[in-house]
């Protein structure tokens, strides 16, 4: 799988130049770029079928699980509950890595564009509250999203709001939006079904 674009929404203080960040960056890149389909192919090829209708396109959550399993193998904690923006039971972050008394989190978008906004808002607020040292939201390009089953949030839809988040006054932290994309499209590969185990993608 390819990383197409990385947008730094928050880039403040010493953390973005630290050894801790370089380790986290390597982990994230490895987790994304190691995702394969079909298994053992050495690349990520989506079935040539737009996901406009029910039952069509490739599943989103199995692709996410493949990334998360790699992060877990690299020492990350999965499904970490963090009370940032709610007084009720907080929803878990997909993956977190502890840096001293703060966390760096990774979210892989499987919902719609509203979900993408919530994820960025939650991570930005976590940085402002000094609960998080940073975060990264991973989501598809528009080119990739058209082959996925759900109307998942995508990079171009979120981009008009980048100036809003970039205007935040933060003294320490790093917040990234990472756009990913398939290596190829083919009608010779299987469709990734919604119920496919993430391990099958590695």
Residue ranges of model-derived segments:
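Active-site metal-binding core of divalent-cation-utilizing nuclease and nuclease-like domains
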Residues: 53-58, 62-101, 112-121, 128
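Conserved beta-strand signature within the Rossmann-like core of class I S-adenosyl-L-methionine
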Residues: 131-141
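Arginine/glycine-rich "motif VI" loop of SF2 helicases in the C-terminal RecA-like domain
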Residues: 126-132, 166-170
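Interdomain/boundary linker segments immediately adjacent to catalytic/signaling cores
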Residues: 1-82
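Structural motif
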Residues: 102-104, 134
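Glycine-rich, phosphate-binding/catalytic loops in enzymes
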Residues: 122-124, 154
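Short beta-strand-loop-alpha-helix junction that forms the active-site gateway
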Residues: 107-120, 142-144, 148
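Domain-level recognition of nuclease-like catalytic cores that cleave nucleotide substrates
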Residues: 141-202
């Amino acid at each position: 799988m390819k990383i197409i674009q990385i947008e730094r929404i928050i880039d403040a203080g010493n953390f973005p130049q630290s050894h801790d960040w370089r380790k986290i960056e390597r982990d994230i890149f490895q987790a994304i770029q190691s995702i394969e389909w079909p298994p053992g192919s050495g690349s990520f090829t989506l079935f040539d079928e737009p996901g406009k209708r029910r039952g069509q396109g490739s599943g989103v959550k199995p692709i996410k699980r493949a990334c998360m399993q790699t992060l877990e193998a690299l020492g990350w904690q999965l499904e970490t509950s963090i009370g940032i923006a709610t007084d009720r039971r907080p929803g878990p972050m997909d993956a977190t890595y502890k840096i001293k008394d703060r966390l760096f989190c990774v979210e892989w978008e499987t919902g719609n564009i509203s979900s993408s906004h919530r994820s960025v808002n939650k991570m930005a607020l976590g940085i402002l509250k000094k609960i998080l040292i940073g975060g990264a939201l991973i989501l598809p390009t528009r080119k990739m999203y058209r082959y996925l089953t759900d109307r998942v949030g995508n990079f171009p839809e979120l981009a008009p709001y980048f100036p809003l988040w970039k205007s935040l006054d933060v003294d320490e932290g790093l917040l990234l939006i990472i756009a990913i994309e398939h290596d190829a499209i083919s009608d010779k590969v299987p469709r990734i079904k919604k119920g496919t185990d993430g391990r099958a993608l590695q």
